[in-house]
């Protein structure tokens, strides 16, 4: 019998409960390039020292349990355990601190966001010794990044497919999002695309309801796409939501979209789940479909400031799981601090290499190596007068989504689309000429109105 598995009755082991910090708090630990690093915002129960709570997070999200078990002797805890290696207070917050935890790469299945989250956040958030816990950021090592396909195509390939360069893309969600027949829905799609938008979009909760079954919607939207392409000479698309109750049904809808020859489908990646999302992403790459991602349900996870997960973590996970676009919100009208934080995770979506910058909420330097980038989608209550700020803040590699800002135009859908396209092209032209969009934005839009049909 192997010495490692041999039962030694005369030796035994020291059973019982012991403090987590004795095993899992290791301030002397030097992190490895292959470690997954996590930054947790911890709010402990009163009277619990930070070192113990940080170590508890590391233990309960890796190899630990509430008591010592004899099977600990059958493996190497030093190789597999998570380690809380640094603790720092949160400025301006009483009794909150950031616990930094390092996880050995062997704890995670290759290419599985599902397994990564199951390990890191699957159980520890219900730990009664903590009042609240929030995952602020993750550092994904290059060795783990390379096990993921990532976005089906990425920013450059999408631009090449669409033959559209040098400006943000324009998009509109069809409203009302529920209740339209498939034919009337397709009519609205045609009017918006014919007016000058690049894309229209299913709302996140449009799947296959009694008033509009998915196959009918796909057919009428495809007709609208082809008609608007023939009349404008531009490549158009509609985000056909393939989200369904089963993975098999989701793939069936994506297959039908491919057979129709449309360029893009859509998925609700949080409600649909990471396993389904990764499967759809792989299908889209293999079959030449772009993949738009909606983040429905994200606020359930990321809205609380001291519990849950920050959206930057969900954004990183999406880039690994796969998607060519994802909604990122917008910074127009928000506080400057929120602007910096939002643009921080926008850079995490688009760029290849992002330096640590705590002022923007980036706790770790992240190297994505060759993983394609994701286009952020700016949405939520924006309209044509926001165009100068959006053009300046988000730059060319973005999608600007005007729902009510298109369909709410007093002259109708097509004029609303025309207004957005004219405003965008005017702002891009002014920017390229060196004009100050922040100072002259209103004047630029008014000048464009004079020549708009």
UniProtKB/Swiss-Prot annotation:
SUPFAM superfamilies: RuBisCo, C-terminal domain (SSF51649), RuBisCO, large subunit, small (N-terminal) domain (SSF54966). Transmembrane segments: none annotated. It is found in: Plastid, Chloroplast. It is an enzyme of class 4 (lyase). Keywords: Acetylation, Calvin cycle, Carbon dioxide fixation, Chloroplast, Disulfide bond, Lyase, Magnesium, Metal-binding, Methylation, Monooxygenase, Oxidoreductase, Photorespiration, Photosynthesis, Plastid. PROSITE patterns: RUBISCO_LARGE. Binds 1 Mg(2+) ion per subunit. Residues 1-2 form a propeptide. GO terms for cellular component: chloroplast. One of its GO terms (molecular function) is magnesium ion binding. The record marks 334 as: Transition state stabilizer. Its cofactor is Mg(2+). InterPro entries: RuBisCO, RuBisCo_large_chain_AS, RuBisCO_lsu_C, RuBisCO_lsu_C_sf, RuBisCO_lsu_fd_N, RuBisCO_lsu_N_sf, RuBisCO_lsuI. Mg(2+) binds at residues 201, 203-204. It comes from the Eukaryota. Belongs to the RuBisCO large chain family. Type I subfamily. RuBisCO catalyzes two reactions: the carboxylation of D-ribulose 1,5-bisphosphate, the primary event in carbon dioxide fixation, as well as the oxidative fragmentation of the pentose substrate in the photorespiration process. Both reactions occur simultaneously and in competition at the same active site. Heterohexadecamer of 8 large chains and 8 small chains; disulfide-linked. The disulfide link is formed within the large subunit homodimers. The basic functional RuBisCO is composed of a large chain homodimer in a 'head-to-tail' conformation. In form I RuBisCO this homodimer is arranged in a barrel-like tetramer with the small subunits forming a tetrameric 'cap' on each end of the 'barrel'. This is Ribulose bisphosphate carboxylase large chain. It comes from Valantia muralis. The lineage of its organism: Eukaryota, Viridiplantae, Streptophyta, Embryophyta, Tracheophyta.
């Amino acid at each position: 019998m192997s010495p490692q598995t041999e039962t030694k009755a005369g030796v035994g082991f020291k059973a019982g409960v012991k403090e987590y910090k004795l095993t899992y708090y290791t301030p002397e630990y030097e992190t490895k390039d292959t470690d997954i690093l996590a930054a947790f915002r911890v709010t402990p129960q009163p009277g619990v020292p930070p070192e113990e709570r940080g170590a508890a997070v590391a233990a309960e999200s890796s190899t630990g349990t509430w008591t010592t078990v004899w099977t600990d002797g059958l493996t190497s805890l030093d190789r597999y355990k998570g380690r809380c290696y640094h603790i720092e207070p949160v400025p301006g917050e009483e009794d909150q601190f950031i616990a930094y935890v390092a996880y050995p790469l062997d704890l995670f299945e290759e290419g599985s966001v599902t397994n990564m989250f199951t390990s890191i956040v699957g159980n520890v958030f219900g730990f009664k010794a903590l009042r609240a816990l929030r995952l602020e950021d993750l550092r994904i090592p290059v060795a783990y990044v390379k096990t993921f396909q990532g976005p089906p195509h990425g920013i450059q390939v999408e631009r090449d497919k669409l033959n559209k360069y040098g400006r943000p893309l324009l998009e509109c969600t069809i409203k009302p999002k529920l209740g339209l027949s498939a034919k009337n829905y397709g009519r609205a799609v045609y009017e918006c695309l014919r007016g000058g938008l690049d894309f229209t979009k299913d709302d996140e909760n449009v799947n296959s309801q009694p008033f509009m079954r998915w196959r009918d919607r796909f057919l009428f939207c495809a007709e609208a796409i082809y008609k608007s392409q023939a009349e404008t000479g531009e490549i158009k698309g509609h985000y056909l939501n393939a989200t369904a109750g089963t993975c098999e049904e989701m793939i069936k809808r994506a297959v039908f979209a491919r057979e129709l020859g449309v360029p893009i489908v859509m998925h609700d990646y949080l409600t649909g789940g990471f396993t389904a999302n990764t499967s759809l992403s792989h299908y889209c790459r293999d079959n030449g479909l772009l993949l738009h991602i909606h983040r429905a349900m994200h606020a359930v996870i990321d809205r609380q400031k001291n519990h849950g997960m920050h959206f930057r973590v969900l954004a990183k996970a999406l880039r690994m799981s796969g998607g060519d676009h994802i909604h990122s919100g917008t910074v127009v009208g928000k506080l400057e601090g929120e602007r910096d934080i939002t643009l921080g995770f926008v850079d995490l979506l688009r760029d290849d290499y992002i330096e640590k910058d705590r002022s923007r909420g980036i706790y770790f330097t992240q190297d994505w190596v060759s993983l394609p980038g994701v286009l952020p989608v700016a949405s939520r209550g924006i309209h044509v007068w926001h165009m100068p700020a959006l053009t300046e803040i988000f730059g060319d590699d973005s999608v600007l989504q005007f729902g009510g800002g298109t369909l709410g135009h007093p002259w109708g859908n097509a004029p609303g689309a025309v207004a957005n396209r004219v405003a965008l092209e005017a702002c891009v032209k002014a920017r390229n000429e060196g004009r100050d969009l922040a100072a002259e934005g209103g004047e630029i839009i008014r000048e464009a109105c004079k020549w708009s049909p």
